[in-house]
Curated annotation (Swiss-Prot):
Entries under HAMAP family matching the protein: UPF0304 (MF_00762)
InterPro entries assigned to the protein according to its UniProt record, in alphabetical order: UPF0304_YfbU, YfbU_alpha-helical_sf, YfbU_helix-hairpin_sf
NCBIfam families xref list: PRK05445.1
The protein's name: UPF0304 protein YfbU
Family: Belongs to the UPF0304 family.
Transmembrane residue ranges: none
Lineage, broadest ranks: Bacteria, Pseudomonadati, Pseudomonadota, Gammaproteobacteria, Enterobacterales
Length: 164
């Protein structure tokens, strides 16, 4: 992240104010303030992650993934023989915090800030699947989009989607 000295000064002052406004996170803000003031390039890359951008298309895909899991769970709930499919297979796991942090952040934003998909269980890891999921979800979406009744799935269709 390239910043002018003036931009660094402004951001440093913002972190100083945040230290006073949010004492619970004061250490974090002091650390970031030091990084900005001293211009530590390696650590400034952390700010790139914090201030990164998630394109509209990616956001829509993540919402589509969450819609798919909503449809999977509702369809599974309506099955007469639910035992043929493990409930965990139709429960949204989230994304990997190590490799898909931006996607994970968006999921948490949608649930915790926007109030959507509040029925999803964040589990003990807060939607951190702890394994990369993007490719798997893409395969699942392709199968789901091919289903004629996306919100009234049969057991066979559910199995095809979760096994994609």
């Amino acid at each position: 992240m390239e910043m002018t000295n003036a931009q660094r000064l402004i951001l440093s002052n913002q972190y100083k104010m945040m230290t006073m406004l949010d004492p619970a996170n004061a250490e974090r803000y002091r650390r970031l303030q030091t990084i900005i003031e001293r211009g530590y390039g390696l650590q400034m890359r952390e700010l790139d992650r914090e201030f990164g951008e998630l394109k509209e298309e990616t956001c829509r895909t993540i919402i589509d993934i969450m819609d798919m899991y909503h449809a999977l769970y509702v369809s599974w709930s309506n099955l007469q023989d639910q035992q043929s499919i493990d409930e965990r297979r139709v429960t949204f796991l989230g994304f990997d915090a190590a490799t898909e942090a931006r996607y994970l952040g968006y999921v948490r934003f949608m649930v915790n800030v926007e109030g959507r998909y509040t029925h999803f269980d964040a589990g003990t890891h807060g939607f951190n699947a702890q394994t990369p999921m993007w490719e798997k979800y893409q395969r699942m979406l392709n199968v789901w989009h091919a289903c004629p009744r996306q919100y009234h799935l049969s057991a066979n269709e559910i199995n095809q989607i979760i096994n994609a």
